[in-house]
């Protein structure tokens, strides 16, 4: 990331994701899944780390992590720097309200692509807190709501090429992509094509779609609804 954004973000654990095609996460890749590491004690910054990525792996809000460690610029951390992964005494995590799941979802949201859900959201699985939608290679992947592009690249481990969009106070990750059509800081509208569907698990076309609000990963159905709308 080159731009400072006041984000509670999806994060970067820089790793090679050859050509943007998904080939299944390695054991190392799984450490990039949100919440794969439990907060507690300090974390020592390693080469290639970003605050964005560290917050992601611990399931934390990047701005809160920055505040706990007196970091004024979330894009500037040093190799060897020790970071507290729990709040100081007397400081609580900010509460997050996630909408209940409904058939229609939230106003202003729609499904990001056409197809059949091939993997449902699983709150008990670090790698399963997302929807995977199967379809046809090259079919349009669209913004699920109006928003601003926060990230474009292949630094989300195990996900190939990805786009993260800030939709108000919700961040959505779209991954397994080909032919990305947007850039960081670009404003997009609901239904606007942002990329094409690439190859997902089992070498079949798919879209990985994950939503996050504050420090919590949320079931995408809370926003897009269980009944497809395009």
Model-identified regions with their sequence ranges:
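Short, acidic/hydrophobic/Gly-rich beta-strand patch recurrent on exposed beta strands
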Residues: 131-134, 161-167, 208-211
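Extracellular LysM carbohydrate-binding repeats and other cell-envelope/extracellular binding modules
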Residues: 18-28, 34-44, 53-56, 60-93
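Zn2+-dependent peptidoglycan hydrolase active-site motif and core
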Residues: 149-178
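Short histidine-centered loop motifs in beta-beta connectors
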Residues: 70, 167-191
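C-terminal motif of bacterial Sec signal peptides marking the signal peptidase cleavage site
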Residues: 13-16
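Surface-exposed, glycine-biased beta-strand/turn segments
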Residues: 78-160, 189-190, 218-221
């Amino acid at each position: 990331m080159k731009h400072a954004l006041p984000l509670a973000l999806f994060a970067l654990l820089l790793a090679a994701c050859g050509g943007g095609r998904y080939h299944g996460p390695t054991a190392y890749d799984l450490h990039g899944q949100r919440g794969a590491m439990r907060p507690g004690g300090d974390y020592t910054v390693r080469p290639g780390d970003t605050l964005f990525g560290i917050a992601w792996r611990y399931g934390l809000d990047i701005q809160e992590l920055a505040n706990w460690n007196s970091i004024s610029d979330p894009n500037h951390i040093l190799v060897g720097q020790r970071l507290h992964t729990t709040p100081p005494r007397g400081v609580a995590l900010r509460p997050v309200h996630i909408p209940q799941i409904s058939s229609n979802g939230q106003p202003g949201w729609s499904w990001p692509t056409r197809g059949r859900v091939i993997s449902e959201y699983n709150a008990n699985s670090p790698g399963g807190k997302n929807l995977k939608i199967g379809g046809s290679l090259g079919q349009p992947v669209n913004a699920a709501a109006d928003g601003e592009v926060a990230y474009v690249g292949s630094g989300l481990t195990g996900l190939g090429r990805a786009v993260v969009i800030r939709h108000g106070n919700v961040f959505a990750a779209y991954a397994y992509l080909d032919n990305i059509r947007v850039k960081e800081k670009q404003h997009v509208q609901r239904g606007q094509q942002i990329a094409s569907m690439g190859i997902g698990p089992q070498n079949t076309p798919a879209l990985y779609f994950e939503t996050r609000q504050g420090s919590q990963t949320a079931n995408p159905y809370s926003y897009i609804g269980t009944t497809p709308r395009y």
